[in-house]
Structures are given as structure tokens and as C-alpha cells.
Amino acid sequence: MSKIKLLMIVFLFAGCSVPDFMIQGQLDDFEIALEAEDVNWIMDQYTDDVVRELPDGFKFKGKDEVRMYWEDLFQSVDNIDVEAIDFVTSGFPPAKLALHWRWKADVVAKAKYFKFDTVGTTIKIEGMDLTYGSGFKTARVITFWNTLDMLQQAGYKVTK
């Protein structure tokens, strides 16, 4: 059986389009890299002039700054479990990707790029990444999560 016929059969049984199938594979690889704390693999997915924005006003420009963010994050958490819940893309190769994700990790040290101390807790959050691509690389990521929920899990009391 030819490879093309085999791919068509796989896509039909998978119930998704070719781009969705390819994106899901890339997201699976990204989950594996996050859980393995593989900074080099993650950095290979970015353009040289990547911009990454986090809640609370943190903005990283270029691979060097983004690498520092990932290294700091991986030094501050253990037992990472991440899951891509859903996504939608635009274009092929994808010019835009909206990703809904779930993250769980044990916080073992204070992160440089998070304003609050949550050391000693296990944080479970859901968030959203808006990703803009350039070819098959990521050029910009804007991340959203609920900081208030994270702080409440860490035992902070929120008052007016």
C-alpha cells in the first residue's frame, strides 16, 4: 500500500484534517519536552526574534531572554504535568494558534518571573496561549492564566 493511501486512511479514522493531525503531533512533542524540561528542544521551536508575553507584565524578546525564562521556570518546579485540552489554528503552515492547556507542577523554588511566593505547593492551572507563527516556528506567544486562582491554591487570602 502506498504511503499516501496509508496517510489518507489514518486521517479518515483519526477524524481530523491534515493540519490538525500535524499540529496535534507537535503539541504532543511539546508536552513531552515540557515534562522532560528539555530547554534545547523548546528553543528550537522559536524564531530568533521570538517575543513571549506572560501575565503580570513580563515580556521576553529574543531567544536569549526566552531561554532564561524557561530555565528559571524549570528550576522552580518539579513533577510537571501538562496537557493540551483544545486548539484552533489559522492557515497552513499555521499563522495563528489558540491553545487551551492545563498545567500541574510542584513549586520547589521562587521563580524570578512570578511576583508571588508559592513554594511548597502544587499548582494546578488552566490557561490559554495565543501563538503567532512564522513558517513552522513560533514568533510570538501571549500567555493567559488566572493568577488569583494560583495564589488561592498556595494559601493566599484575597481581601478587598
Explain the meaning of each model-derived region.
Residues 17-22, 53, 67, 71-160:
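A beta-strand edge to alpha-helix "cap/lid" segment located at domain peripheries
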